[in-house]
């Protein structure tokens, strides 16, 4: 049964690499990159329409633009969404880390992004697929 797919990912994530780590050099397990994974699910669900929306950073504390990719079809309910946070690390958008509060965490995770709330975007996506009963 097809399932909807939602992903938010920083392009400079040094924990879960955007381009993947098939050879498991990072020790987190082998995995494909986001471009291949998103395309796999779009193809698997026969999603023949897509759009790319560029969202310029408007936050004061970050300069991370967002590229929103949406794949869908008029023939089925499934969709695939990807929020690509440009130059961002392993962080949850809407959550901010100030470097002076925790320099080590800021170094590894990035400063965050306040242009979107990941929690709100996740809910907006998945509430479309709720069924009655």
What are these regions (language model features)?
Residues 2-3, 35-133:
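Alpha/beta-hydrolase-fold serine-hydrolase catalytic core, especially in secreted/extracellular enzymes
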Residues 9, 32, 86:
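Residues at the C-termini of beta-strands that transition into short coil/loop
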Residues 14-19, 23-33, 92-95:
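Conserved alpha/beta-hydrolase "acid-adjacent" motif
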Residues 1-4, 20:
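Flexible "cap/lid" loop of the alpha/beta hydrolase fold
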Residues 7-9, 13:
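Short beta-strand/loop motif that positions the catalytic acidic residue
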């Amino acid at each position: 049964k097809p399932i909807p797919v939602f992903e938010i990912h920083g392009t400079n994530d040094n924990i879960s690499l955007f381009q993947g780590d098939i050879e498991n050099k990072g020790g987190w397990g082998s995995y494909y990159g986001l471009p291949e994974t998103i395309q796999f699910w779009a193809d698997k669900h026969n999603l023949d329409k897509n759009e790319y929306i560029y969202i310029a950073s408007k936050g004061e504390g970050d300069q991370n633009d967002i590229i929103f990719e949406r794949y869908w079809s008029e023939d089925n309910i499934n969709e695939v969404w990807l929020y690509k946070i440009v130059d961002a690390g392993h962080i949850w958008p809407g959550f901010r880390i100030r470097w002076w509060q925790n320099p080590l965490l800021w170094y590894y995770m990035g400063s965050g992004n306040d242009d979107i709330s990941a929690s709100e975007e996740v809910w907006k996506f998945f509430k479309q697929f709720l069924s009655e009963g």
